[in-house]
A protein has these predicted regions:
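Inter-lobe coupling/hinge segments of SF2-like helicase ATPases
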Residues: 275-284, 288-295, 301-738, 754, ...
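Short beta-strand elements
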Residues: 182, 596, 752-764, 805-813
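Short secondary-structure junctions
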Residues: 15, 590-593, 748-757, 801-806
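Accessory, non-ATPase domains that flank or precede helicase/AAA+ motor cores in DNA-metabolism machines
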Residues: 1-442, 454-470, 780, 788-792, ...
Length: 817
């Protein structure tokens, strides 16, 4: 039978239950240009709706009349490399997402098209006959009349507006089947490529000078020619701006073939270092020893993974710089991931100073155009060093040699929306594909990573001392129960007050850390006990003093606070401390002392993290009050005091990682102190000073913490001694959610009961969010294909089964909540 060229295509409209590569015919005009990694428009589903697709592979197949042809090719060149296509397919299997979900994570938003469906009247349509064919169906007649009223070409959105609350899909499908309408797709790029025009002489220098003598009555044209005779080539806009000539003068010279205009791609870039690259500082003996071991792994012909444990201020970044230098010298590229956008300005400044224009930055805070152009620079090989947050792990780097994840224990490397990937898992896959070195760095490594290093999965390196023999901060534990007994019910202990006073006297800076925004966590009535709760979520509202608003930090609901209790008219009390309340308390204790608050609300007002950080350094503001974004990676040489308020807050929650998160948080924030010449101090305020995790964090003793924590996890059978896989169900009706969860639990117990501990249904910590109830079934199991296949099967079944149509079901590896 005749073999024809076909393409395996991932289709945007395919849901997880129906997601697979679909086979399409390749029309003759596309056989020479179509390649894997190109996007196409294809007819999809029963109604042949135009839909975007990504070509995953080319093949030959027997001719079959049921095969649909590709409508058109959208990309002249592939936008995905074969490696990134393999990554998307792997993510589909690993993270329970569609291939297109993975593609949306891999590619920047600026590369996508806005695709709209357009319904067109068939050629030579007889309108009266067509309306007669519609019979008594009001919906078919309305759809046809709407298309005809718009000149025979009508977008789907317009038809949906005409139908109001009703769905036009059935009527449109019938009209297409009767060949009264045809369906087309119209696509528009989200971000367009920017081009710059450059002007140069199109004639010899002698001819240009002769033209100058002839054109004395055209001074603007003369000015343009004279400038180009002098400098040779320049931006057309700059030539007009410098000479004062209008663009019409330039166009006249181009038309007369005296000046030539060439276009070149222009890359919109974030602010970056523009000086000459400088040499990287020398390593200390301890750093050089670590670097030597890592350099050997970097040169290995096989993929390698290593964990670098270094106390805060030990100089891990300097080791990174030397490794990247080695990778570049070998013709390889490097990616460095940081956990927070707030860390990228410092990292970019440092790395650009040594590698110049070879550095690109990728994070969600960039404008779409800048992020798209940075992606293009990386893809074109113009940037060989990438610095960014979680999504930078997908940078289209060819010949990747080194991938570094700094502060690898941070939760921000895990995506909480589809696809629910962890950057560390993606990094392992990419390094395996490129035979590259994966380096995990941290002062408080993830317990699982440390276990893998101990058992030989990762190579292990340590920097146990601070750079240049600087001491770790001296830490004081402040017992807040004793403070209450002494009559101090404020947020600042007497110990911390004394240390702040001393720092102000010395002219040194301090940081106060509290992991909560707002002024007060809870507003309650002193008489009847009534509280303010979010109408959409099962949480209380947080009071923000600056605008006197009560805010839900889950759904964004806002309302003004009342002057008195809306239930009984009693006096309102504001309980709990937030960053705004701490700032007010500091001002009350130290009148006239300037403070800087760094949380999400303050950043929204300032515009960027960088603006606040620069103010803190430049103006030497005495006290910074911040949330979790100040706990890691930032380097302030004049900060000699750190105060940790409510250190117990993350300790007593229902999560097996509570100890680890608390230890890491305290250790990281304490590590911001004493990074300059002056010694550092830290005060940890706690209601449980005898707690072993608090005491280990105060001593900065990671090894002791790890030993106690790994023993506890082995006893409980939690990671790394098992894998956690959760299936979450959400819906507007709580009973429907619980019923679906119970079905999923029973399914797992019947199919994989002996290979997994099945728990649930259990509500999530915030059971109702945005008016949707959320319950979960959790598996503690060994990682296996059978368990993952069972999870994928039940997710697909529940999302297509009519009896569960009122709920949404998804699976997740090692969820954060």
């Amino acid at each position: 039978m005749l073999q024809i060229p076909v393409a395996k295509v991932a289709v945007l409209a395919a849901t997880f239950a129906f997601d697979r590569p679909y086979t399409y015919k390749i029309p003759q005009p596309l056989t020479d240009t179509l390649r894997p990694g190109c996007r196409v428009m294809v007819p999809f589903s029963r109604g042949n709706r135009p839909c975007e697709g990504m070509v995953l592979a080319l093949d030959q197949a027997q001719d079959d009349p049921r095969l649909k042809p590709i409508t058109r090719q959208l990309d002249p060149e592939p936008i995905l490399s074969p490696e990134l296509i393999r990554l998307a397919i792997w993510m589909h299997d690993r993270f329970f997402c569609t291939i297109y979900d993975a593609l949306h994570a891999i590619l920047p938003a600026g590369v996508w098209y806005r695709v709209s469906t357009v319904y067109c009247a068939a050629p030579e349509l007889d309108a009266d006959a067509a309306l007669a064919l519609c019979g008594r169906s009001k919906q078919r007649r309305l759809a046809l009349e709407t298309v005809l009223a718009h000149g025979g070409r009508c977008p789907l959105e317009t038809l949906q507006t005409a139908f109001g609350d009703k769905d036009p899909a059935s009527a449109l499908h019938w009209l297409v089947e009767q060949k009264l309408l045809t369906v087309e797709g119209a696509e528009k790029r989200v971000v367009r490529d920017k081009q710059l025009e450059y002007a140069s002489l199109a004639v010899s220098l002698e001819e240009a000078q002769e033209e100058i003598r002839r054109r004395r009555r055209a001074p603007h044209q003369v000015a343009i020619l004279e400038l180009l005779c002098t400098i040779g080539r320049a931006s057309a806009d700059e030539v007009c701006q410098f000479t004062g000539a209008p663009k019409s003068s330039m166009k006249t010279l181009v038309r007369q073939e005296l000046v030539r205009i060439d276009t070149e791609p222009y890359f919109r870039r974030p602010t970056h270092y523009t000086g000459q690259p400088k040499p990287i500082p020398a390593l200390t003996a301890a750093q050089a020893e670590v670097f030597s071991g890592l350099q050997a792994l970097l040169r290995s012909p096989d993929a390698q993974a290593a964990l670098l444990f270094g106390v805060t201020g030990s100089g891990k970044t300097l080791v990174y710089l030397h490794l990247i230098e080695q990778a570049l010298a070998a013709g390889q590229g490097a990616i460095l991931l940081v956990p927070e956008i707030s860390l990228t300005p410092q990292m970019i400044e440092a790395f650009s100073a040594y590698f110049g224009d070879a550095v690109a930055v990728l994070h969600s805070g960039l404008p779409l155009s800048e992020r798209y152009d940075e992606w293009k620079r990386i893809r074109a090989g113009l940037a060989r060093v990438v610095v960014g947050t979680r999504s930078a792990v997908f940078a289209p780097m060819e010949n990747l040699g080194l991938l570094i994840i700094d502060e690898e224990q941070e939760d921000t490397y895990k995506s909480e929306s589809t696809p629910r990937y962890h950057a560390r898992d993606v990094a392992k896959f990419r390094c395996a594909q490129h035979r590259a070195l994966l380096l995990l760095g941290s002062a408080t490594p993830d317990v699982v990573s440390r276990y893998y290093a101990e058992t030989g999965r990762y190579h292990y390196f340590t920097l146990p001392d601070r750079f240049n023999a600087r001491k770790l901060p001296d830490v004081i534990l402040a017992d807040m129960k004793q403070e209450l007994r002494n009559g101090n019910s404020g947020s600042i202990s007497s110990v911390l007050y004394a240390e702040l006073e001393e720092n102000l006297r010395r002219g040194e800076q301090s940081i106060l850390f509290l992991n909560r925004r707002g002024a007060s966590k809870l507003v309650t009535c002193a008489e009847c006990g009534a509280t303010y709760s979010c109408p959409n979520c099962s949480v209380s509202l947080t009071y923000h003093q600056g605008n006197q608003m009560l805010v839900c930090h889950h759904c964004g609901y806002r309302q003004r606070v009342d002057d008195q209790c809306p239930v009984c008219g009693g006096e309102l009390r504001f309980l709990g401390d937030g960053t705004e309340r701490i700032e007010a308390d500091v001002h009350a204790l130290f009148p006239g002392v300037e403070t800087l608050r760094m949380d999400a609300d303050a950043i929204a007002m300032a515009g960027t993290h960088e603006a606040l950080l620069q103010r803190f350094v430049r103006e030497r503001i005495p006290i910074m009050i911040g949330t979790q974004m100040i706990t890691k990676g930032l380097n302030f040489e004049n900060v000699t005091l750190v105060g940790v308020l409510n250190a117990d807050q993350s300790l007593y929650v229902g999560d097996y990682r509570a100890n680890e998160r608390t230890f890491s948080l305290i250790t990281q924030v304490v590590g911001r102190s004493g990074r300059g010449d002056a010694p550092g101090r830290a005060v940890i305020q706690t209601f449980t000073p005898a707690n072993e995790t608090i005491r280990q964090a105060a001593r900065q003793d990671y090894d002791a913490f790890y030993r106690s924590e790994i023993a506890l996890r082995q006893l409980n059978g939690t990671p790394p001694f098992s894998e956690v896989l959760a299936v979450t169900v959400s819906g507007a009706q709580e009973n429907a959610v619980v019923r679906c969860c119970a079905y999923i639990r029973d399914y797992f117990r019947q199919t994989i009961g002996e290979r997994a501990e099945v728990l649930g249904p259990a509500p999530l910590p915030v059971v109702r969010m945005n008016n949707r109830y959320r319950y979960r079934v959790t598996l503690y199991c060994s990682q296996s294909r059978e368990v993952r296949r069972a999870a994928a099967n039940i997710v697909m079944y529940c999302n297509t089964e009519k009896s569960f149509r009122d709920v949404t079901v998804f699976a997740d590896d090692n969820p954060l909540d």
